[in-house]
């Protein structure tokens, strides 16, 4: 460390953790390749008002990153107003599985492209990502102002037409709020499709195209020593080297462990704004009264259902928590770290006021 290294200007002794990044992320949960789960209206409602919706649940459990398609094949009992009947079926399915957390999205498939059918999807799948066909101009105009994702059916013949559809309908930023799902109709993912998939920030494809997010921790900075009932300042630096964001809500947690004693802390990280590239989160945690000694510091990213987000780092993981290092807890009369960031910038250690003019 050189004479003028920024570490020399730290206000307290810190430890910097830099996990080794893995060469590739092989975690395909909520990422990468998807599978269609196609459900037949005729089979799931063979008699009016009699449903076999448990079949959907079985199919979802068997699929990896399922994308739901409600196939509008008309049952024999339907005599009049088939689109209205299908809309009622959509609402029934939505009420049954809207809270299902495993779905990548639900394709908006209809009989007549009617507003009643579209509204059935919008109203019934409130917590799911609705996927509109990129080339269904009328539907996309109707969804304008609402949150929706895209299903892009493309190949090496029509990839330019897909690019034109993105441009004409101003869909370049859809990926920031909802997934762009790629359906490659060729046998494999050709060079044009692969290149454009990166431009469209596609999160999933029906073939292995290396899409989705790839989240890692670049650095975690924490103090060597903290006070019982004091403050723990933490500085996280994450990076998403993938091409899409993470569409399910998740939160950042920290845990301190000493023997059988464990303390968990939820952090206030704005993870909904984490897209691609680098992002930092700085936070000072208020610690409870703790026994003095050395604690293992771990961190985790949990989805709302408490499943953990797998990071692309070479670090020991247990129960979703990645081990980062150790922190020494002492009993002190004052908390020296309570207002530690009030007088200097923690990422650069620069003073928050202009230096005085030399005499």
What spans do the regions from the language model cover?
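A mature extracytoplasmic/lumenal domain signature
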Residues: 70-72, 110, 301
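Low-complexity, intrinsically disordered regulatory segments enriched in Pro/Ser/Thr and acidic residues
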Residues: 81, 88, 103, 356-359
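Extracellular/luminal regions of secreted and cell-surface proteins that mediate adhesion/ECM remodeling
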Residues: 211-359
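Catalytic-core regions of glycoside hydrolase
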Residues: 2-25, 102-206
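Conserved, mostly hydrophobic/aromatic
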Residues: 35, 63, 93, 106, ...
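Short amphipathic alpha-helices and their capping/turn segments at secondary-structure boundaries
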Residues: 24-28, 54-64, 91-98, 286-287
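Hydrophobic alpha-helical segments with transmembrane-like composition
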Residues: 85-97, 103-112
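Aromatic-lined substrate-binding rim segments of carbohydrate-active enzymes
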Residues: 28-81, 85, 117-129
């Amino acid at each position: 460390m050189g004479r003028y290294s920024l570490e020399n200007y730290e206000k307290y002794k810190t430890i910097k953790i830099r996990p080794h990044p893995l060469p590739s992320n092989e975690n395909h949960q909520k990422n990468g390749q998807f599978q269609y789960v196609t459900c037949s209206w005729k089979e799931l409602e063979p008699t009016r008002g009699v449903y076999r919706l448990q079949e959907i649940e079985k199919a979802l459990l068997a699929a990896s990153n399922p994308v739901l398609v409600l196939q509008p094949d008309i049952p024999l009992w339907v005599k009049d107003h088939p689109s209205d009947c299908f809309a009622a079926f959509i609402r029934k399915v939505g009420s049954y599985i809207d809270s299902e957390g495993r779905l990548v999205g639900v394709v908006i498939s209809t009989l007549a492209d009617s507003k009643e059918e579209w509204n059935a999807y919008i109203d019934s799948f409130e917590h799911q990502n609705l996927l509109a066909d990129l080339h269904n101009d009328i539907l996309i105009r109707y969804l304008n102002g609402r949150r929706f994702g895209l299903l892009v059916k493309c190949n090496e013949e029509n990839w330019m037409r897909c690019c034109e559809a993105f441009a004409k309908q101003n869909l370049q930023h859809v990926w920031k709020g909802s997934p762009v799902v790629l359906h490659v109709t060729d046998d494999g993912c050709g060079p044009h499709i692969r290149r454009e998939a990166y431009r469209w920030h596609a999160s999933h494809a029906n073939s292995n195209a290396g899409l989705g997010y790839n989240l890692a921790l670049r650095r975690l900075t924490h103090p060597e020593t903290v006070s019982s009932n004091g403050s723990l300042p933490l500085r996280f630096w994450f990076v998403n080297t993938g091409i899409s964001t993470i569409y399910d809500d998740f939160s950042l947690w920290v845990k301190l462990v000493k023997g059988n004693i464990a303390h968990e802390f939820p952090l206030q990280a704005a993870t909904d704004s984490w897209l691609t590239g680098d992002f930092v989160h700085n936070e000072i945690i208020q610690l409870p009264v703790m026994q003095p000694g050395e604690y293992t510091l771990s961190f985790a990213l949990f989805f709302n259902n408490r499943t953990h987000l797998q990071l692309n780092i070479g670090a020991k993981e247990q129960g979703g928590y990645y081990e980062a290092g150790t922190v020494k807890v002492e009993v002190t009369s004052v908390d020296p770290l309570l207002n530690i960031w009030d007088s200097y910038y923690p990422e650069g250690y620069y003073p928050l006021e202009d230096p005085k003019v030399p005499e």
